[in-house]
Amino acid sequence: MTNAVYLASASPRRKELLTQLGIEFTQFSVDADESQLPNELPYDYVERLARLKAQSGVALGYTDRPVLGSDTVVVIDNQSLGKPCDENDFTHTLKRLSGNTHQVLTAVAFATTDKVLSCVVSTNVTFKTLSDDEIHTYWQSGEPQDKAGGYGIQGLGGRFVTHISGSYFAVVGLPLYETEQLLQTFLRG
Ligand SMILES: Cc1cn([C@H]2C[C@H](O)[C@@H](COP(=O)(O)OP(=O)(O)OP(=O)(O)O)O2)c(=O)[nH]c1=O
């Protein structure tokens, strides 16, 4: 088996990040049910989804190379926040992130027909205090809509971040170092 993989993701960020790793890949999207189970912990949730996306790729017939699935959630007060469903939801989220530190959890999974291997990377991100105006203007930029927690650290949302501890790449959607390590372990095992 060569180093080439499949990327089971619709995310343009994950495509860019995987390109940055120099791994040859083919991208396709999978349609996974992303709802959280009752009482499911954020860590378990994000890891389950990454595995589900990878295994859905295998189930679609992409079986000749490892399939990479990944998922990102923002966690504050033990609650997982996905993409905002509307401006109200977004405003509520940004007010919770404002002036606080939250965690971004990104899970990565590789799957083939006979095995699946995954890991979760946690990064702490601290936001400055945001005004109502800043929050409203940011929503109108169109950037928050498709991003976990309603912000993009790599875009206009970057100016809200006063401190980050951990993997910047994991916040954007794919931790470079950990993904490469996981693939090496997967291919060896
Ligand atoms: C917090 C944060 C999230 N994000 C993105 C990463 C993920 O693409 C997205 C979270 O949604 P995900 O459901 O993890 O991924 P996705 O729907 O974009 O792609 P797919 O499921 O097909 O792989 O939020 C940023 O781009 N920047 C950030 O700062």
Curated annotation (Swiss-Prot):
The active site is at D71 (proton acceptor). Its cofactor is a divalent metal cation. It comes from the Bacteria. Its EC number is 3.6.1.9. One of its GO terms (cellular component) is cytoplasm. The record marks R13, T72, Q154 as: Important for substrate specificity. Belongs to the Maf family. YhdE subfamily. It catalyses: dTTP + H2O = dTMP + diphosphate + H(+); UTP + H2O = UMP + diphosphate + H(+). SUPFAM superfamilies: ITPase-like (SSF52972). The keyword Zinc does not apply. This is dTTP/UTP pyrophosphatase. It is found in: Cytoplasm. One of its GO terms (molecular function) is UTP diphosphatase activity. Nucleoside triphosphate pyrophosphatase that hydrolyzes dTTP and UTP. May have a dual role in cell division arrest and in preventing the incorporation of modified nucleotides into cellular nucleic acids. InterPro entries: ITPase-like_fam, Maf-like.
